[in-house]
Regions:
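Cleft-lining beta-strand/loop regions that shape enzyme active-site pockets
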Residues: 25-29, 166-167, 172-180, 189-381
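Ser/Thr-rich, Proline-interspersed low-complexity disordered segments
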Residues: 67, 440-462
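Extended, small/polar residue-biased N-terminal targeting/export presequences
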Residues: 90-162, 212-214, 218-227, 235-237, ...
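Extracytoplasmic/secreted proteins, especially bacterial periplasmic and envelope-associated proteins
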Residues: 76-83, 87, 100-104, 108, ...
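Conserved P-loop NTPase
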Residues: 375-379, 387-416
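Extended hydrophobic packing segments that form well-structured cores
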Residues: 424-442, 449-452
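Terminal targeting/pro-maturation regions of precursor/exported proteins
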Residues: 2-119, 459-461
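PDZ/PDZ-like domain segments forming the peptide/carboxylate-binding groove
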Residues: 91, 135-187, 191-195, 258, ...
Length: 462
């Protein structure tokens, strides 16, 4: 909940005909749902660091129906809540929907945590979130991030924290409408988005197939309105190509949806067994994450080192997460690098950490987002659902990177011009892989002498 300003009582009696009408709280009962969720493991970045739905690990589960115990301690703890609820529901001069009050109380629980990755979701937001994770949803086909002038993640949209397009999905309505990487979105359907979070804006942009949303876009100093007709978006998370005269296989992952691991396995197998590439580049830049089991399977395609990473609950010891058998490129004679930046978050950081920490690949680019928690996604029947941070994930040497990120072995800061055609990071990746194939030593940057300590206080939501 947000604090509302409180005005001092007036000593003058105003003319009642000039008084504004009392706000009416929603009074229509909300439909109940009998949906039952199955247990899944997911990792998503809600836009993820700067946005992009970035980054969070999730477990989707079913509420067991248990309620807090009725001990004297709990009764004392909840007495102020029930006193306030009873007083409002019985004595508030306007109309009151008890479901609306309960929803507000649930929101308050999650807001009190101060964790942007733990959040109450309305039924619409809950469905949209799960659709985005699965790889299919109705929208326009944009991935975005909130970034400051230096390209670093930031929180709520402001004059110094702008909502920037980081990826336009192939064959999407946004691409057909002319949207480009680097575009800055300043308004949706004519309404400015200053003060909103990236999740707020994504909710505004998504909508039923066939409807139109108009984005106000700033590009190269010019402002324009771009109408886009929404459609079903099929995310194509994994693409590949052959570089350097057939010597290097390049794989780009834009997100970790339910089919990403199999898609990557198929493309990687083709690169290694059909194209006979000798080295690999895995591009995880601006990848906000997705399913956590996809991250485990994708890391297993490149290394059989054990453990890949660790998971830890609030009260338990770290538990190792093991590789799956049958990886298509676990042969360490195939050199590889991973390209990363500040938009590399959550599931993509798990893969990056597994490959860097097990000495399978060098990281090239800039420091990653720093999303080190895993969320549990649960449905509240008839009342939406929520995501709650329930576990940490740790690198192979049990380092927690939350709010800190992974530091690349070779640091290359992103260009100020997000739309410039030259890709210095990819060029460096090609250079490093070719050097390793030739047996030439590769010079890496020294590790940082000091880095911020991980914390569960709010980090920029993505």
């Amino acid at each position: 909940m947000t604090d509302q300003p409180v005005s001092e009582p007036s000593t003058d009696m105003p003319d009642m005909t000039d008084m504004p009408a009392l706000p009416t709280l929603p009074s229509e009962p909300r439909p109940r749902s009998a949906r039952t969720s199955t247990l899944l493991a997911l990792l998503v970045v809600f836009v993820l660091g700067g946005g992009a739905l970035f980054v969070s690990g999730f477990t989707l589960g079913r509420l067991a129906g248990a309620t807090p115990g009725t001990t004297d301690a709990n009764q004392d703890l909840f007495r102020p809540f029930w006193d306030a609820y009873t007083d409002v529901s019985q004595n508030y001069v306007g109309e009151v929907d008890p479901h609306f009050l309960v929803e507000g109380a649930i929101k308050g629980i999650f807001n009190a945590l101060g964790d942007p990755f733990s959040q109450y979701l309305t039924e619409e937001e809950y469905r949209a979130s799960l659709g985005g994770i699965s790889g299919e949803f109705e929208g326009v086909g944009l991935e975005m991030a909130t970034q400051d002038a230096a390209g670093q993640p930031c929180d709520a949209i402001s004059d110094t924290c702008r909502l920037r397009v980081t990826h336009v999905v192939r064959r999407s309505p946004a691409l057909a409408a002319g949207m480009q990487n680097g575009d800055v979105v300043s308004a949706v359907d004519g309404a400015a988005i200053i003060g909103k979070t990236i999740d707020d804006v994504i909710t505004l942009i998504r909508g039923p197939k066939g409807t139109v949303v108009t984005l106000t876009v700033v590009r190269a100093g010019s402002t324009m309105d771009v109408p886009i007709t929404r459609d079903v978006i099929q995310r194509e998370d994994v693409t590949s190509q052959v570089l350097a005269d057939g010597k290097i296989g390049y794989l780009k992952i834009d997100g970790f949806s339910s089919g990403s691991a199999q898609d990557l396995h198929d493309l990687l197998t083709e690169l290694v067994q059909t194209n006979h590439v000798q080295g690999l580049i895995l591009d995880l830049r601006d990848d906000p994450g997705g399913y956590v089991d996809a991250a485990q399977k994708i890391a297993s395609e490149f290394t059989s080192a054990d453990p890949l990473y660790w998971e830890q609950t609030a009260t338990g010891a770290p538990e190792p997460q093991h590789p799956s058998p049958g990886g298509a490129a676990t042969d360490t004679n195939i050199p590889m690098v991973v390209l990363v930046n500040g938009g590399t978050a959550s599931a993509s950081e798990i893969v990056s950490a597994a490959l860097q920490g097990n000495q399978r690949a060098l990281l090239i680019g800039s420091r990653t987002y720093g999303k080190g928690t895993i969320q549990e996604f649960k449905e509240l029947p008839g009342a939406g659902g929520y995501r709650l941070s329930v576990r940490k994930w740790l690198t192979p040497d049990q380092t927690w990177i939350h709010g800190v990120g992974l530091f690349p072995n070779i640091n290359i800061e992103p260009p100020a011009d997000q739309q410039q055609p030259n890709d210095a990071v990819l060029d460096k990746g090609i250079q490093v892989v070719l050097a390793e194939l030739a047996g030439t030593p590769v010079v890496t940057d020294p590790p940082p002498t000091h880095s911020p300590q991980p914390t569960l206080s709010p980090v920029p939501s993505a």
